[in-house]
């Protein structure tokens, strides 16, 4: 057992938890030792992480001033500099709230008329009206 712990490859893993030994022990892992993992987790900053196929976690590196957005084209300067919030849309809605509500009411009324014509025909033939 001691001949395995004397190898340089397993030296940084002596105090690592068992679950991390496989990810940290690979030669192409992004963490060279367990101290880097402790420093990155104790920094107190919220970071995003990617995972490699081997299970090692690496912090995503974004250029300063840029953020990850799911858009197909570049944003204008005022939109790009505004902080992201889940309750603020990036663009103004195209339809006003009044138009949207009236559209729903008209759709419900039209649906009721379309359904009532076959029902009225069926019941008029059934009761000879």
UniProtKB/Swiss-Prot annotation:
UniProt lineage: Eukaryota, Viridiplantae, Streptophyta, Embryophyta, Tracheophyta
Transit peptide: 1-58
Segments for region (Disordered): 27-66
GO molecular function terms noted in the UniProt entry: electron transfer activity; metal ion binding
InterPro entries assigned to the protein according to its UniProt record, in alphabetical order: SQR/QFR_C/D (IPR034804), Succ_DH_cytb556 (IPR014314), SuccDH_FuR_B_TM-su (IPR000701)
Gene3D superfamilies per record: Fumarate reductase/succinate dehydrogenase, transmembrane subunit
Function, as annotated: Membrane-anchoring subunit of succinate dehydrogenase (SDH).
Cofactors, names only: heme
Pathway(s) the chain acts in: Carbohydrate metabolism; tricarboxylic acid cycle
Gene Ontology terms: cellular component: mitochondrial inner membrane; respiratory chain complex II (succinate dehydrogenase)
Name under which the protein is recorded: Succinate dehydrogenase subunit 3-2, mitochondrial
Keyword line: Electron transport, Heme, Iron, Membrane, Metal-binding, Mitochondrion, Mitochondrion inner membrane, Transit peptide, Transmembrane, Transmembrane helix, Transport, Tricarboxylic acid cycle
GO biological process: mitochondrial electron transport, succinate to ubiquinone; tricarboxylic acid cycle
Organism name: Oryza sativa subsp. japonica (Rice)
Compartment annotation: Mitochondrion inner membrane
Assembly and oligomerization: Component of complex II composed of eight subunits in plants: four classical SDH subunits SDH1, SDH2, SDH3 and SDH4 (a flavoprotein (FP), an iron-sulfur protein (IP), and a cytochrome b composed of a large and a small subunit.), as well as four subunits unknown in mitochondria from bacteria and heterotrophic eukaryotes.
